[in-house]
């Protein structure tokens, strides 16, 4: 699972990507151009928990929940996607199973999960 690191990449995804909301988390997905030789072939994941998600302990827990849920779903995600998960306040009080269901549902709704033929979106 590759990480989105730079502020420029996060800003590009937030500006140009499509957003999908769930009560626990928001997903912003952006398909990278397939001909970009500077980008890795796999999908990249970024995790954000702003101050609206609670105190630092709650924000860190929310990001841990999101990372673990995304790690479990990463093999199903097609290549070439930049995905940013934004934690909402109720996520910090949620269980791992609830976070996993939310992430998996958002990935399906965004059509970034590979289907039976191995293609995504």
Language model feature labels by segment:
Residues 1-121:
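Positively charged, solvent-exposed patches that mediate nucleic-acid binding
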């Amino acid at each position: 699972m590759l990480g989105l690191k730079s502020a420029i990449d996060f800003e590009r995804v937030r500006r140009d990507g499509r957003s999908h909301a769930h009560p626990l988390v928001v997903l912003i997905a952006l398909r990278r151009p397939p001909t970009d030789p500077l980008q890795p072939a796999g999908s990249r994941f970024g995790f954000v928990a702003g101050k609206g998600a609670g105190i630092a302990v709650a924000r860190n827990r929310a990001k841990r929940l999101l990372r673990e849920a995304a790690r479990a779903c990463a093999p199903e995600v097609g290549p070439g996607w930049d995905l940013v998960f934004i934690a909402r306040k109720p996520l910090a009080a949620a269980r791992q199973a609830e976070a996993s269901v939310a992430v998996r549902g958002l990935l399906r709704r965004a059509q970034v999960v590979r289907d039976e033929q191995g293609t995504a979106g």
